């Protein structure tokens, strides 16, 4: 699935209007119908609902939704904030104001000057339709005060498209008291880039994406740097069967350089994961102290003893290996850095750096210059910051891995709730299949193994 910037989303709307053709007000009605259906599945007609609509198209969505809710027996209290200079509304917002007025609904109030907020209780619902993703500046004045009031009310808050005050992409100066904190965000067609950043979760709450049937040709032809990988995408690309006359050598020979004294568990987990996920042969290069552990715990693996008793001192370079993975439990000292430097200058096979191999890069940045094209780095956020310095938020980290991937012609897999994969062509692919249960020791060793198993077997 493509993820578009705010600017590109405006283009999608405009081209859908042109290609279908459909009027902008009818496209807004389509969005309101999707919103109304989801709200009715979430909120009871007996629940008190307050709708706060801004002067732009986000407000138009809110007013159209209010009208459709009234048609379904709901009794929302609706406030339209027409407080911009010259009291100008967007054309579609103005048209939906007139449609709502014609219903004769008594609890519709247009605010043009001072506003005394209603008493909103914790059992009520607030529908936030003040500002959408097109907002360009942080909220100030009366709108900032209204946002604080909404957040302090304890009500169940539903934001239309995006919480008011939150920008669609980067939020470098996000202030908690100027952004609505929604419990549920109902967005359109595809998620906003901002939804993938951990620092914004407290604003978006649960997110649901509503299909408003933007023109498929428009989506297909509009370029983007951002993509979302779903479980369905992964399932379509998994090799489900093997030829009857298969040989283990058909599925790659992986060299795993991992482990040190007292840290062999990482090597065991990685080797087992590689074998379970389909690689034909696995050789584990570890210090000599690992012999009994590996031969017992992973009998299918070939043990490749290092000359070091307790630490890896060198990593073999041999054409028999179809891919090499380095780092789990390996340790990070001068000998490790030296072994990696020798390897990256000689190797031609696909290479994956994880864990302590990444920490070696943090110690010796020049390693990056010698990495073979399309080497895969698999840091979590702390490993990333050890390598490239402190970063305050996920948005900064995303920019960092994009820069690193394009500069060094490598792939960076930033592990997290929405794992971000930066490719050398500048694109970012988010993986939506993770879950909090993976936040445990060893899961990174297994996850990285799945990456290099793919490299070894292809």
Sequence positions of predicted segments:
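Internal gly/pro-rich beta-alpha loop/helix module
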Residues: 130-221
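Alpha-helix C-terminal capping/helix-to-coil transition sites in glycosyltransferase folds
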Residues: 121-122, 181, 320
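Small-residue (G/A/S/T)-rich helix-start motifs and N-terminal tracts that mark the onset
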Residues: 1-82, 90, 94, 184, ...
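Phosphate/ribose-phosphate-bearing ligand recognition and processing surfaces
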Residues: 57-60, 86, 135, 164, ...
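Positively charged, low-complexity/disordered segments
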Residues: 456-458
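Nucleotide and nucleotide-moiety/phosphate-recognizing core
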Residues: 36-125, 129, 138-160
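Glycine-rich phosphate-binding loop
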Residues: 125-139, 324-331
């Amino acid at each position: 699935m493509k993820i578009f910037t705010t600017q590109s989303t405006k283009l999608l709307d405009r081209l859908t209007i042109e290609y279908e053709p459909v009027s902008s007000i009818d496209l807004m009605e389509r969005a309101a119908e999707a919103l109304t259906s989801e709200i009715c599945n979430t909120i009871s007609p007996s629940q008190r609902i307050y709708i706060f609509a801004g002067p732009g198209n986000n407000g138009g969505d809110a007013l159209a939704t209010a009208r459709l809710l009234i048609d379904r027996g709901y009794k929302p209290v609706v406030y339209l904030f027409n407080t911009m200079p010259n009291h100008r509304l967007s054309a579609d917002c103005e048209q939906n104001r007139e449609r709502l007025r014609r219903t004769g609904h008594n609890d519709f109030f247009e605010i043009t000057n001072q506003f005394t907020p209603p008493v909103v209780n914790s059992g009520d619902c607030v529908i936030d339709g003040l500002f959408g993703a097109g907002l360009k500046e942080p909220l100030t004045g009366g709108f900032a005060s209204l946002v604080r009031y909404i957040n302090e009310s304890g009500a169940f808050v539903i934001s239309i498209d995006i919480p008011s005050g939150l920008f669609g992409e980067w939020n470098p100066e996000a202030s908690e008291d100027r952004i609505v904190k929604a419990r549920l965000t109902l967005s359109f067609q595809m998620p906003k880039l901002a939804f993938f950043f951990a620092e914004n979760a407290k604003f978006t709450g649960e997110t649901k994406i509503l299909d408003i049937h933007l023109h498929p040709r428009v989506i297909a032809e509009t370029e983007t740097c951002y993509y979302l990988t779903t479980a369905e995408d992964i399932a379509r690309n998994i090799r489900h069967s093997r030829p009857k006359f298969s040989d283990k050598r058909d599925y790659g020979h992986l060299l795993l350089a991992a482990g040190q004294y007292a840290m062999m568990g990482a090597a065991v987990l990685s080797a087992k994961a590689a074998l379970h996920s389909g690689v034909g042969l696995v050789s584990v290069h570890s210090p000599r102290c690992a012999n009994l552990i590996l031969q017992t715990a992973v009998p299918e693996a070939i043990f490749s003893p290092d000359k070091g008793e307790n630490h890896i001192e060198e990593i073999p370079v041999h054409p028999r290996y179809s891919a090499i993975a380095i780092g789990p439990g390996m340790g990070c000292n001068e000998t490790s850095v030296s072994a990696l430097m020798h390897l990256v200058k000689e190797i031609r096979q696909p290479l994956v750096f994880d864990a302590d191999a990444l920490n070696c890069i943090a110690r010796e940045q020049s390693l990056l210059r010698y990495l073979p094209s399309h080497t895969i780095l698999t840091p979590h956020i702390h490993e990333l910051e050890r390598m490239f310095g402190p970063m305050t938020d996920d948005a900064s980290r995303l920019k960092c891995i994009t820069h690193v991937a394009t500069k060094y012609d490598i792939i960076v897999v930033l592990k997290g709730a929405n794992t971000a994969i930066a490719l050398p062509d500048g694109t970012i692919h988010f993986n939506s299949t993770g879950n909090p249960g993976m936040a445990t020791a060893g899961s990174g060793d297994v996850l990285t193994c799945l990456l290099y198993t793919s490299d070894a077997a292809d």
